[in-house]
């Protein structure tokens, strides 16, 4: 009995910084152009402006522009809008759970667990944005590892996000003790080549 090649699932993580560029302009369409250029199936986003009194927010806009489903995990309010992490997916989202990673008086942080129904298997994707203080990150890394290692959640798991940490920092070392690390250097080189060949964002509007 022969089996065909295993399907490839392209996953990206992207801190969009409220969709604001270096020019100070808030342009979700430019974020959508980058995501479109890398042709990602699933994208974990951080620092996303969500729904507010006058609109549905950037996660909804990006989902509509890219034709992707989305879920958001607000951590706090920002000028009347929810603010936090979001996940975009071309595949059905089977389940969405949130975990509080906040520590003491530091900025509120939440983690998403998004179960992606990809072909015949479910991928458990964990989207995180760790804090900027070292003790805060240590607490969050320990809690994150405990959540991800829950044996009641079977199947493949992937932790992505903005760790606010060096590759060999305290938080990443703590996580590496419990989880397998993926060497991203080759993928980053590919990503750079894709962006170099992508059309200007202005032309992608």
Q: Predicted regions: what is each one?
A:
Residues 51, 57-59:
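Membrane-embedded segments
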Residues 19, 46-52:
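Active-site neighborhood of divalent metal-dependent phosphoester/pyrophosphate hydrolases
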